[in-house]
Design a protein with these regions (language model features):
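Surface-exposed, low-hydrophobicity beta-strand/loop segments enriched in small/polar/acidic residues
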Residues: 1-144
Length: 144
């Protein structure tokens, strides 16, 4: 699935995308040489969440055109799928995101806590949670 914005101000900013790279709508985005592309699990400086899908069939796929990105603030909450089984005990803990092929949205990996890019702030079901992004935003409660 995807990271779906549920509450907060949802500030959208335009960023130039990396040319010839697929991006899933609702995927976590990071910077690559000044352009945005899908984040990998090692990405700790995140740009936000993609609002638009970029596919190889798009007219601007091979160009570094701009796409809208929701830039998370301390108030923004996102619904996210998990890899593993979520429980109420996950609330308040920090986790990594998955690394997926470009064009496929990431999940929160409940077994991985190396990079800690999200904090679970609410339990929805065994397969979904609410999260806030850590990174370089105010909500982060770890040293950068």
């Amino acid at each position: 699935m995807a990271f779906i914005h549920k509450s907060g101000p949802a500030l959208c900013e335009p960023f130039a995308k990396l040319a010839s790279t697929a991006i899933a709508v609702g995927s976590v985005i990071s910077f690559t040489s000044g352009y945005v592309s899908q984040a990998v699990k090692e990405s700790v400086r995140l740009a936000g969440v993609a609002v638009r899908k970029i596919a190889s069939t798009d007219d601007d796929f091979a160009s570094a055109t701009t796409i809208s990105v929701i830039v998370p603030s301390s108030e923004d909450i996102f619904e996210a799928d998990v890899t593993g089984t979520a429980t109420q005990a996950n609330v308040g803990k920090q986790y990594d995101i998955s690394t997926t092929n470009a064009g496929t949205s990431q999940t929160v990996v409940l077994a991985n806590t190396t990079y800690k890019v999200v904090t679970v702030v609410g339990f929805i079901s065994a397969s979904k949670v609410y999260v806030k992004f850590n990174g370089n935003y105010v909500f982060a409660n770890k040293a950068n």
